[in-house]
């Protein structure tokens, strides 16, 4: 027999972000705990609104299946002595409710142990759910939980009611919260405004429909879809197109139970404000959706003097709600207009002295000092990249002004507009387009998935800003630990790598870090002998993560290009970021087309055996390290001659970074190496004669070293 189960937790208005998180958590937690309780079920439906969390489980058996379990007891030598049961055996059998003759001895990896096969009768589902429900509530996680009344129960907002039904029967659940006891029933509440009365849920399976009649759309996806469609329709009514941010849409979805679209209007005089100011006021501060005139790209769109909001109130009072919304946004936009006019009253450069009042970090001084460091680092990068004199001037100017907007009134009020306003104020002050654009772009990327700077000036200053933060904070010994990363150092390092790769900048990061660290120590009298090693390891770890997660390179191929605690590969990786990326992608491609498989066996085998030798890994040429007089077979001579032919191809690949040429050469040598190992004229590498052994290991070492120009084949796993 199967039943439908309903649990609803009724609350005061929950934070929107918690509603979404709770859905995700329950979608994982509830099926997992049911499976652990032998009540596996594929029909777990989680619902949530600002005032309730609910789950409906269909086709739930009324009891667990009966089952057998093998239960491990004490070691056999402790349970039996001279063939007779000891107190340990008696205690185990008593605890399990079985007879002594039911005990069995089985051999495990850790020795012989006593076991018992126990038949366990399935419990009623109602009893199991009674145990699980408090755990489902207790295990929910969020940022801010609270206590209420005089109890110890914690939840983001006070719990006001519980519904728990198995089909049409109430499942008794009690949540104790000091003197307050919350007891399950079949009564829920409808919409606060549209249906504030109690509603009775007669059957668990009817939950969604009963709530809908009380003006509650409990299904997050349905609610979100309705809101999105209402916004689009409303925008079309005013001959516009709404910009629907996925983040804002998700938030608004969890702020309402029965969404109603409301169209508002603002004075056209505010359209002279930069569009980013108006949309920031709407989206970030008021949770309104802006409306645009065209369907072009966002940057080209022209704002209309309208906005769209989603109300949780009475649809018949939409006009009154719109008036209230219009009053609020008028005040906010008037503030923005005042800030904008005030900020434009003086040129952007005149704000630089005020940066002395903004602290970057207590020991590192003000943002003005950070700007000086950014200018210095930007010059180093421009020098490395051999940038033209004209572009270098733009870079230096933009670096000087890149943080000036932080002390403007607009950015003080709307911090998310940093860089955006700097670009506009720079343009208004007569700075070149390259300088203005670079001021905005140096903040890019602002997070995972964000756009990257497109201009060389923006790229250089963005790199300089991030490298300054990394070296300075690491220089103070403030390394990120676990989830604690207050200066967003991981994001900064990711930005350095992604910008370099996106723009194909041939950066020598190893040299840059040395130069920046030297200047840092001179300026701040800090001593940290491990700084470069710590920074190198940190950046290499970020490179590894990006290759794995964003470039989808196999883990063993990532290890092959970065090495495993290999000093040569570490330094090489930071000296040429583009080469690391290109080698990883190339390896992935030749794995997929089968070419890697054709050279893998011989090179991997050679690499593993060569580890027993002492040949320097940078040695490529056989002339100085191979004694042909020690050859005992034709296969050795053939191997030697093949290596002589291989070296020029390796050197060309090393110089041009054309690794296909090296792989072609390795393909050519592979049969010769196979014959050396397993052919009719094969040899024993580990010869009793130490000189012959060394000579043969050197042959293998040379092949390994030539292949190392591409990757460490010892790290590659057979596909």
From Swiss-Prot:
Enzyme Commission code(s) on record: 6.1.1.14
Region (Disordered): 65-84
Subcellular location: Cytoplasm
Catalytic activity: tRNA(Gly) + glycine + ATP = glycyl-tRNA(Gly) + AMP + diphosphate
One GO process term, biological-process aspect: glycyl-tRNA aminoacylation
Pfam families assigned to the protein according to its UniProt record, in alphabetical order: DALR_1 (PF05746), tRNA_synt_2f (PF02092)
Key words of the record: Aminoacyl-tRNA synthetase, ATP-binding, Cytoplasm, Ligase, Nucleotide-binding, Protein biosynthesis
Assembly notes: Tetramer of two alpha and two beta subunits.
Full protein name: Glycine--tRNA ligase beta subunit
Annotated source species: Trichodesmium erythraeum (strain IMS101)
């Amino acid at each position: 027999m199967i039943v439908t189960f309903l649990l609803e937790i009724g609350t005061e208005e929950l934070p929107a972000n918690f509603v979404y998180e709770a859905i995700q958590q329950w979608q994982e937690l509830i099926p997992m705990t049911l499976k652990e309780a032998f009540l596996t079920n594929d029909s777990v439906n989680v619902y949530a609104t600002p005032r309730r969390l609910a789950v409906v489980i269909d086709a739930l058996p009324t009891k667990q299946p009966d089952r057998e379990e093998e239960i491990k007891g004490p070691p056999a030598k402790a349970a039996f002595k001279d063939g007779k049961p000891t107190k340990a055996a008696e205690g185990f059998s008593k605890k399990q409710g079985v007879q002594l003759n039911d005990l069995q001895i089985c051999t495990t990896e850790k020795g012989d142990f006593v076991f018992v096969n126990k038949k366990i009768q399935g419990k009623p589902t109602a009893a199991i759910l009674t145990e699980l429900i408090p755990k489902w509530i207790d295990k929910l996680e969020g940022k801010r939980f609270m206590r209420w009344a005089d109890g110890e129960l914690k939840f983001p907002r006070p719990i006001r009611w519980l519904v728990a039904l198995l089909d049409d029967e109430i499942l008794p659940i009690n949540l104790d919260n000091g003197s307050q006891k919350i007891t399950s029933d079949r009564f829920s509440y409808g919409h606060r405004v549209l249906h504030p009365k109690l509603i009775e849920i007669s059957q668990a399976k009817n939950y969604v429909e009963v709530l809908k009649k009380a003006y509650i759309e409990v299904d997050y996806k349905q609610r979100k879809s309705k809101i999105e469609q209402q916004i689009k329709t409303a925008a079309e009514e005013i001959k516009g197109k709404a910009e629907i941010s996925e983040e804002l849409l998700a938030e608004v979805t969890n702020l309402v139970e029965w969404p109603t679209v409301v169209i508002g209007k603002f004075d056209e005089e505010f359209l002279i404000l930069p569009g980013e100011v108006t949309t920031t006021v709407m989206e970030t501060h008021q949770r309104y959706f802006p409306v645009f005139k065209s369907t072009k790209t966002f940057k080209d769109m022209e704002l209309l003097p309208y906005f769209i909001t989603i109300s949780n109130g009475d649809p018949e009072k939409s006009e009154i709600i719109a008036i209230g919304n219009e009053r609020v946004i008028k005040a906010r936009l008037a503030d923005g207009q005042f800030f904008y006019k005030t900020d434009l009253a003086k040129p952007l450069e005149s704000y630089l002295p005020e940066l002395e009042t903004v602290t970057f970090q207590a020991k590192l001084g003000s943002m003005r000092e950070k700007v000086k460091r950014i200018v210095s680092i930007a010059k180093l990068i421009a020098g490395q990249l051999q940038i033209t004199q004209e572009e270098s001037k733009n870079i230096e100017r933009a670096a000087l002004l890149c943080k000036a907007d932080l002390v403007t009134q607009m950015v003080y009020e709307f911090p998310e507009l940093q860089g955006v306003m700097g670009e506009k104020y720079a343009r208004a002050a007569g700075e070149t387009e390259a300088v203005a654009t670079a001021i905005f772009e140096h903040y890019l990327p602002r997070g995972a998935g964000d756009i990257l700077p497109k201009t060389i000036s923006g790229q250089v200053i963005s790199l300089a800003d991030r490298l300054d933060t990394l070296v300075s904070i690491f220089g103070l010994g403030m390394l990120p630990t676990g989830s604690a990363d207050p200066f967003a150092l991981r994001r900064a390092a990711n930005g350095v790598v992604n910008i370099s790769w996106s723009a194909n900048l041939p950066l020598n990061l190893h040299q840059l870090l040395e130069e920046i660290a030297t200047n840092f120590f001179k300026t701040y009298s800090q001593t940290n002998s491990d700084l470069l090693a710590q920074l190198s390891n940190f950046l290499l770890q970020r490179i590894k993560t990006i290759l794995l997660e964003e470039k989808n390179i196999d883990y063993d191929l990532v290890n092959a290009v970065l090495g495993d605690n290999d000093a040569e590969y570490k330094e090489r990786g930071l000296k040429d970021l583009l080469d690391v990326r290109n080698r990883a992608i190339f390896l992935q491609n030749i794995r997929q087309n089968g070419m890697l498989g054709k050279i893998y066996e011989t090179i991997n085998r050679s690499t593993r055996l060569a580890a027993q030798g002492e040949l320097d890994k940078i040695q490529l040429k056989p002339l100085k390290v191979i004694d042909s007089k020690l050859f005992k077979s034709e296969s050795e001579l053939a191997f030697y001659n093949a290596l002589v032919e291989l070296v020029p191809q390796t050197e060309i690949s090393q110089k041009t970074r054309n690794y296909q040429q090296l792989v072609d050469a390795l393909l050519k040598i592979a049969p010769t190496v196979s014959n050396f190992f397993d052919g009719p004229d094969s040899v024993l590498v580990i010869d009793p004669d130490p000189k012959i052994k060394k000579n043969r290991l050197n042959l293998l070492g040379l092949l390994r070293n030539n292949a190392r120009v591409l990757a460490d084949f010892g790290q590659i796993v057979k596909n």
